[in-house]
Amino acid sequence: MRIKGVVLSYRRSKENQHNNVMIIKPLDVNSREEASKLIGRLVLWKSPSGKILKGKIVRVHGTKGAVRARFEKGLPGQALGDYVEIV
């Protein structure tokens, strides 16, 4: 089952930004319980040039269904607001 998601932001604090950890909101997932079922699944982002960057969902973020995904390499800023595929 493949799910689409939107890249919301980098994982960050007031002074630090973790470029290889992204906050992703899967579409049609609205609770922490539903999001926890996605932990361990693969996340794919396709760049405009066709390169595919892979990540893995590592934990839930908040109570509205967002998740954190750790990528092998950090995603570029142009990925913000773009769609990813959760496999």
Curated annotation (Swiss-Prot):
Keywords tagged on the record: Ribonucleoprotein, Ribosomal protein
Superkingdom of the organism of origin: Archaea
GO MF entries: structural constituent of ribosome
CC terms in the record's Gene Ontology section: ribonucleoprotein complex; ribosome
Pfam families, A to Z: Ribosomal_L35Ae
Quaternary state and interactors: Part of the 50S ribosomal subunit.
NCBIfam families: PRK04337.1
Record's protein name: Large ribosomal subunit protein eL33
Originating species: Pyrococcus furiosus (strain ATCC 43587 / DSM 3638 / JCM 8422 / Vc1)
Gene (name only): rpl35ae
